[in-house]
UniProtKB/Swiss-Prot annotation:
Keywords for the protein's UniProt record, in alphabetical order: Methylation, Ribonucleoprotein, Ribosomal protein, RNA-binding, rRNA-binding
The protein's role, per its UniProt record: Forms part of the ribosomal stalk which helps the ribosome interact with GTP-bound translation factors.
Cellular-component GO terms for this entry: cytosolic large ribosomal subunit
Family assignment from sequence similarity: Belongs to the universal ribosomal protein uL11 family.
Record-linked NCBIfam families: L11_bact
PANTHER family reported in the protein's UniProt record: 60S RIBOSOMAL PROTEIN L12, LARGE RIBOSOMAL SUBUNIT PROTEIN UL11M
Protein name: Large ribosomal subunit protein uL11
One Pfam match: Ribosomal_L11_N
Signal peptide span: none
GO molecular function: large ribosomal subunit rRNA binding; structural constituent of ribosome
Organism: Magnetococcus marinus (strain ATCC BAA-1437 / JCM 17883 / MC-1)
Length: 142
């Protein structure tokens, strides 16, 4: 029989740098999970990713206090900021002038990387989703 899932935990940790300090420690500790076991497993799975890139993770907590986790791709905003060479997006998007520019080729590259996590059937729909994220950040797609 399958294990009974008691909770789901959503976290965002830097690749290869999960530590038992907040936010990881308290989130896992309140469910009685072994924090160091998660940190070691997460760091091992993200060792080949770009260091310090934010990696969303969905942790399934089982009744016997064991867990499994699923890694997602980094957020679109992370890829867009990297492509535009910015530290952050606009404070008032669509009112202030664009803070940066990304090309459609860059948008397509980001869409291909994010395709597994996006709710899109084809690359064109994924490109529109990423372009919308860029617009919300105050970036101009050229």
């Amino acid at each position: 029989m399958a294990k009974k899932i008691t909770a789901y935990i959503k976290l965002q940790c830097p690749a290869g740098a999960a530590k038992p300090s907040p936010p990881v420690g308290p989130a896992l500790g309140q469910h009685g999970l072994n924090i160091m076991e998660f940190c070691k497993a997460f760091n091992a799975q993200t060792a080949n990713m770009e260091p310090a890139s934010p990696v969303p993770v969905l942790i399934s907590v089982y009744a016997d206090r064991t867990f499994s986790f699923e890694l997602k791709t980094p957020p679109a905003s992370y890829f867009l900021k990297k492509a535009a060479g910015l530290q952050g997006g606009s404070k008032a998007p669509n009112r202030d002038p664009a803070v940066g520019k990304v090309t459609w080729a860059q948008v397509e590259e980001i869409a291909k990387a994010k395709m597994v996590d996006l709710n899109a059937n084809d690359i064109e729909a994924a490109k529109k989703i990423i372009a919308g994220s860029a617009n919300s950040m105050g970036l101009e797609v050229v």
